Amino acid sequence: MNTSILAPPESLLEAQKVRLAIREGYDRPTAGMANGLTQVNMISVPQDWAYDFLLYTQRNPQSCPVLDVIDAGQFQSRLIQDKQHDIRTDFPRYRIWEYGQCVDEVNDATSIWNNHPDLVTFLIGCSFSFESALLNAGIEVRHITDQRNVPMYLSNIPCASAGRISGNMVVSMRPIPAAQVSQAVQITAKMPRVHGAPVHIGDPKSLGIADLSKPDFGDFPRILDGEIPVFWACGVTPQAAVMRSKVPFAISHAPGYMLITDVPDQAWML
């Protein structure tokens, strides 16, 4: 890989330690871990569905920004230098999908993967990767403060279909003080490879979200007086497409349980 985009040695060591802890059974959301390093979503689909999925990601770059594609039979990413890493073990939690239904959650997907050797894997940018920039600007990230998972919602925003794949956008939400919303927009707009600027600010009902306290994925948020809900496109969108399109088989990360890479967040800053 291009070592010029790697994080400094001390950060690489931290990433390696986190991946090892996950491999050995750590099972919690990864927001705030290995601060400053890129985290990624994952979706793995059978080879005969891979082109449709690739086209789907290209038509929906804000919600599905592809950072790497891993061929069938391969289990390592160009985003990680450490040769011990394995995408089958280095996410804290995986979801197993059959015909659009989540049938299981596991912490190690190796044996399941062995039964499906034709899976092609897409690593998708994650909004966790702009959170260090928000924190550095003095903007609180509430789910990190509260040590909870980020709230995510299935919106009414349709994605552009591709072949057999269709679905609506999933959005993540962060409550931001009104006086800091414009700054949060400016910061995240500079990072389009990890979802970029918000897709909506304010009234959740405009997105088809009836109750913010009941996210479709993640934990319910704590919103304080004077804060505005701000919504970003989310890399869980491919899972919504799996559900809608009834893909025969797929493996994904569990929402909020990401892979830590060796690439610094700043690598995606324009």
Curated annotation (Swiss-Prot):
> What EC number(s) does its UniProt record assign?
4.2.1.-
One Pfam family matching this protein: D-Glu_cyclase
UniProt keyword terms in alphabetical order: Lyase
Superkingdom assignment: Bacteria
EC primary class: lyase
Reply yes or no: does the keyword Lyase apply: yes
* One GO MF term: lyase activity
Q: Which family, according to the similarity comment?
A: Belongs to the D-glutamate cyclase family.
- Name of the protein in question: Putative hydro-lyase ACIAD2519
